[in-house]
């Protein structure tokens, strides 16, 4: 039963990361001033 909890935890974390990446890309597309520096770094990270 403990292993099942770990699987759920990993899936939730991965889902959050994917969602965060989507939001990040939207912000970069809109060219928000605050995110411009982070977006430059973000281009080097393969999502």
From Swiss-Prot:
Where located? Cell inner membrane
- Keywords assigned by UniProt, alphabetized: Cell inner membrane, Cell membrane, Membrane, Repressor, Transcription, Transcription regulation, Transmembrane, Transmembrane helix
Periplasmic side: which ranges?
27-47
Note the topology in the membrane: Single-pass membrane protein
Pfam families documented for this protein: MgrB (PF13998)
UniProt main location, coarse: membrane
Keyword Cytoplasm in record: no
Q: Which residues cross the membrane?
A: 6-26
Q: Which GO terms describe its biological process?
A: cellular response to magnesium ion; negative regulation of phosphorelay signal transduction system; response to acidic pH
Reply yes or no: does the keyword Ribonucleoprotein apply.
no
In the record, the note on similarity to other proteins reads: Belongs to the MgrB family.
| Subunit composition and interactions | May form homooligomers. Probably interacts with the periplasmic domain of PhoQ.
Q: What does this protein do?
A: Represses PhoP/PhoQ signaling, possibly by binding to the periplasmic domain of PhoQ, altering its activity and that of downstream effector PhoP. PhoP-regulated transcription is redox-sensitive, being activated when the periplasm becomes more reducing (deletion of dsbA/dsbB, treatment with dithiothreitol). MgrB acts between DsbA/DsbB and PhoP/PhoQ in this pathway; the 2 periplasmic Cys residues of MgrB are required for its action on PhoQ, and thus PhoP.
Q: What is this protein called?
A: PhoP/PhoQ regulator MgrB
The species this protein belongs to is Escherichia coli (strain K12)
* Gene assigned in the entry: mgrB
